[in-house]
Each structure stands twice: as structure tokens, then as C-alpha cells.
Amino acid sequence: MAKPLKQQKIAVLLGGTSAEREVSLNSGNAVLTALRNQGFDAHPIDPKEYPVAMLKEQGFDRVFNILHGRGGEDGTIQGLLEQIGLPYTGCGVMASALTMDKMRTKMLWKAFGLPVADMEVVTRTSFSQLNPQVVVEKLGLPLMVKPSLEGSSVGLTKVNAIDDLKSAVEFALQYDETVLIEEWLSGDELTVPVLGNEVLPSIKIVPQGEFYDYEAKYIADNTQYFCPSGLTEEREQELRQLVKQAYDVVGCRGWSRIDVMLDGEGKFRLVEVNTNPGMTSHSLFPKSAATVGYSFEQLVVKILELSL
């Protein structure tokens, strides 16, 4: 019989070595404080400084994983935790690895008949054959160019002119071997949290600049968020069903946040999955959860309770 959660020693994994280290430290400290305030025996563990493989030997019973980006959100730490036999929050190995790869996630959604943006894929090896003319004929202008793997909108460019396409792809290739060139989705940007099997209210993101980049996500205070997002109840219901399908198709569990854009005709298009959403004062998951009655501390405890 497992010990009650309050009697378990809980490691809060935070920091790490990805480009999103700082955000993870902020999220981790917020989660740590929330757990301690609720009477949990929680300890901060930064994999950059502490060997995670030793956690079980050190008497830990469970992990709250709030690492962001590569290493923490891509299946590697999940595999290690499976190996040493510690239950952890969030998605398992397969869903974490898959959703870190935006291209393969979209291909899977598309195969299940779920709506995504039209795209072309360029790799380092295929770059020399890139024909901007053909791409623009197929996808139009403007275009969105982004690395397939890096999180937090690093390496993104909006391409307005055909002559700028190659340099945008080269820029994105600095961050990843594989780059996506996508049709520009001109409608609203939404993000939808899922907690266990419950889809929470959508949030509308209105950045002051061209799109929601790293600075807007974590630094700027001029990005506006609306929750509820202003969709009609009928549209919100349609979005809820779409997001739940998207979540299930890629095998998410525990909690995740799914980004959705509207195209020029107002149709939903799935963008990507965040399997370890931010949990800072700026973060969107807690904002949405608050509208259905979760305090930040209750939300953190619920995510912990969903750990497997």
C-alpha cells in the first residue's frame, strides 16, 4: 500500500540545461512553495547539479517534473524516472518525446483527420534544394518559419517576401536539423489547458507584436490574455472536443496545454502541445484553472495527484 501523498518525499525537478532553464526555475519555485504551503515534503532538485538517477536511493517517493524544453520535456527524464521506478507528473516517455517534435505531432494529427496548418518540411540536407517559388505557390505569403524542436518560440520568423524565405530557414536551422515552413494563420491565437480528462476554458492570446515569442511569453507585460476567450459557447464546445481528441491521439496524460490558431476563415488549426506548461505568475494554465475555481495551490496538488 503506497504511503499517503503527504507522507511521501517529493522531488520538484526544476532548472535543467535547456534554453528554457530560467522559466523552469521560476515555475519550479512557485510549485515548490505551493506544495510546502499545503503541507507536502517537497524539495527542489536541479538536474544540472544533482544526479536524478539517485533520487530513489535518497528516499524520494515521487517527482513533480516542472522542467521545460529539451531534457525535461522530451522523454529523456521520463525514461530515467521509469527506469528507477519513481512516479512522476505529466506525460509519459512516448507522448513527451513525440510532442517535442512539432512536425511528427502534426503528421499524426493530420493522419487522424484533425486540422493543422499546411506545411513544408526542410532539413539541413534538403536545404540546398529549397525552391522558394514552389513553396510560396503552395502555401502563399506570409509564411511562418520555425525549428521543429525548440520550445518557447526560439528561432521563429515571419516571412513576408519570397526573397526572405531562405535566410529565415537558415536562421531556424541554427536551432534544429528540421524546420517547418507553414502557411500563415491570420486568426486569433488560443491556448487550451487539459487537466487529467478535463478540458479547461480556452485563453485568447493577444500579443502586441507580430506573434507570441519568447519575450512576450515570459518578459513583456504588454501581451494581453483573455479567459474566457470570447468564443461562443458552441465554438468553445467544438474547441474542447478538438483539443481532447488532439490530447488523446498523442497519448498525453496528467496535464498539458494545447495551442490552437484560427485561420483566415475562422477554422481551428492545432499548433502544438506543451507537456509541461509554465507555472509562473505569468503563466496561462493557472489563469484558466482559476476561472473554474482552482487556486494555484489546489492546481499544483491536483497535478501531483494525477502523477503515475
Curated annotation (Swiss-Prot):
* Alphabetized UniProt keyword annotations: ATP-binding, Cell shape, Cell wall biogenesis/degradation, Cytoplasm, Ligase, Magnesium, Manganese, Metal-binding, Nucleotide-binding, Peptidoglycan synthesis
Biological process (GO) annotations?
cell wall organization; peptidoglycan biosynthetic process; regulation of cell shape
Coarsely, its chief localization is cytoplasm
Q: Which note does the record give on the cofactor?
A: Binds 2 magnesium or manganese ions per subunit.
Residues annotated as binding ATP are: 136-191
Q: Which InterPro entries match?
A: ATP-grasp, ATP_grasp_subdomain_1, D-Ala_lig_Van_CS, D_ala_D_ala, Dala_Dala_lig_C, Dala_Dala_lig_N, PreATP-grasp_dom_sf
Pathway, per UniProt? Answer: Cell wall biogenesis; peptidoglycan biosynthesis
Coiled-coil regions listed: none
Q: Looking at the record's lineage, which domain of life comes first?
A: Bacteria
Catalytic activity annotated for this protein? 2 D-alanine + ATP = D-alanyl-D-alanine + ADP + phosphate + H(+)
Localization (cell)? Cytoplasm
Per UniProt, the enzyme's principal EC class comes to: ligase
Which coenzymes or cofactors are required?
A: Mg(2+); Mn(2+)
Does Lipid biosynthesis show up as a keyword for this record? no
Q: Which cellular component, as a GO term, is one annotated location?
A: cytosol
Q: Where is the ATP-grasp domain?
A: 106-305
**In which residues is Mg(2+) 1 bound?**
D259, E272
The positions annotated for binding Mg(2+) 2 are E272, N274
What are the GO MF terms of this UniProt record?
ATP binding; D-alanine-D-alanine ligase activity; metal ion binding
EC number(s) reported in the record:
6.3.2.4
Entry's Pfam families? Dala_Dala_lig_C, Dala_Dala_lig_N
HAMAP family in the cross-refs: Dala_Dala_lig
**Which family does the similarity line name?**
Belongs to the D-alanine--D-alanine ligase family.
What is its biological role?
Cell wall formation.
Q: Which NCBIfam families match?
A: D_ala_D_alaTIGR (TIGR01205), PRK01372.1 (NF002378)
The protein, known as: D-alanine--D-alanine ligase
What is the name of the gene encoding this protein?
Answer: ddl
